[in-house]
């Protein structure tokens, strides 16, 4: 048993312009090769495009998209007696948000289009409306958890 104490959970810092933690979480996930200024540019351009498309507050659209994509339950592979079962587990709010952001960015990277800001803005607007690849991924995860409900006692 470890003598070290449990690590304190760090609170996410907020970004300089919108003063929002979700935007900063998004920036840190979109980051590639340490180019944080480029990540900020992409996010801010995407939010500006959302403002132009929907004529509403882009932060509201972002919150709505993340709320729509956040899963309540997921499956985890658990090995029991030589066979691997997909065991459904509940997900906390922080982990759910992180998954939602990862799915949104993955779906926007797969989209055809000009640049990442355009693709991200389109995916966020679609997710806020309840469509898009990220929403499909959430529904697929929920279906998997529902199908494997019989193994829930293996937790």
Swiss-Prot record:
It comes from the Eukaryota. One of its GO terms (cellular component) is chloroplast. Signal peptide: none annotated. It is found in: Plastid, Chloroplast. Its main location: plastid. One of the primary rRNA binding proteins, it binds directly to 16S rRNA where it nucleates assembly of the head domain of the 30S subunit. Belongs to the universal ribosomal protein uS7 family. Part of the 30S ribosomal subunit. This is Small ribosomal subunit protein uS7cz/uS7cy. The lineage of its organism: Eukaryota, Viridiplantae, Streptophyta, Embryophyta, Tracheophyta.
């Amino acid at each position: 048993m470890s003598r070290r104490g449990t690590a304190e959970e760090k609170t996410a810092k907020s970004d300089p312009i919108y003063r929002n933690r979700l935007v900063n979480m998004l920036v840190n996930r979109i980051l590639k090769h340490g180019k944080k200024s480029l990540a900020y540019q992409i996010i801010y351009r995407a939010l500006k495009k959302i403002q132009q498309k929907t004529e509403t507050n882009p932060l509201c659209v972002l919150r709505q998209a993340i709320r729509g994509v956040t899963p309540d339950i997921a499956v985890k592979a658990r090995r029991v007696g030589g066979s691997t079962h997909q065991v459904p587990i509940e997900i906390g709010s922080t982990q759910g948000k992180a998954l939602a952001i990862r799915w949104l960015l993955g779906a926007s990277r797969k989209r055809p289009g000009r640049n990442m800001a355009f693709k991200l803005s389109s995916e966020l607007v679609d997710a806020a409306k309840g469509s898009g690849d990220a929403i499909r991924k959430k529904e697929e995860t929920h279906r998997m958890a529902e199908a494997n409900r019989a193994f829930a006692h293996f937790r």
